[in-house]
Design a protein with these regions (language model features):
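Metal-dependent phosphoester/phosphodiester hydrolase catalytic core
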Residues: 1-178
């Protein structure tokens, strides 16, 4: 879903429905916080994760340890950056559901995930035309709606968080010739 006209640095509560059927519990744990205005000095704490799409016990242990560390240090996670290979072994819709979204649901319900496509997602998704399960799972800013310059493609995009500008590139299947 695309959501627009939100205030900067604000908390929004949400529910997910499929038609009339509510898919999320009606409670305040389903919320997210928008980014601060570009150029604003603001603390930033984020995770950078890659090659995590196995869906196995070790993946769950790492996620649990990261969450416990945040709680112990009383840190608010502002961003989750994934550098690819979220859905082993072929990046199918089912693999995304089971090995990424289900596994990281406690974090993803409150934290925006900015993702890049890895080679496993590249087996079923193509950056040149933006088609496939990866592009069904993510709506990436291609018109500079999150800061920076328009890329025209979801395969590479940028976004701002306060004074920090992030650039996300698909290094898997796009032609890189000048």
């Amino acid at each position: 879903a695309r959501i627009s006209n939100l205030n900067s640095n604000s908390i929004y509560y949400y529910s997910v429905f499929d038609g009339e059927k509510r898919l999320t519990p009606k409670d305040s744990s389903y919320h997210f916080k928008t980014h601060p205005k570009p150029g604003t000095k603001s603390p930033l704490y984020f995770w950078v994760v890659g090659d995590s799409g196995t869906g196995g016990e070790n993946q769950a242990k790492v996620h649990t340890a990261m969450r416990k560390y945040n709680q112990f240090k009383n840190l608010e996670l502002n961003l989750y950056i994934h550098v690819g290979d979220m859905a082993y072994s072929s990046g199918t819709d089912g693999e995304f559901s089971e090995r990424f979204f289900k596994m990281y649901e406690p974090t993803l319900r409150n934290t925006v995930c900015w993702a890049a496509m890895g080679n496993h997602e590249g087996k079923t998704s193509k950056g040149e035309n933006g088609i496939g399960p990866y592009y069904d799972a993510y709506i990436c800013p291609k018109a500079a709606e999150a800061g920076g310059l328009p890329s025209g493609k979801e395969a590479y995009y940028s976004f701002d968080y306060g004074k920090v500008h992030f650039i996300v590139l698909d290094s898997h299947d796009l032609d890189r010739r000048p």
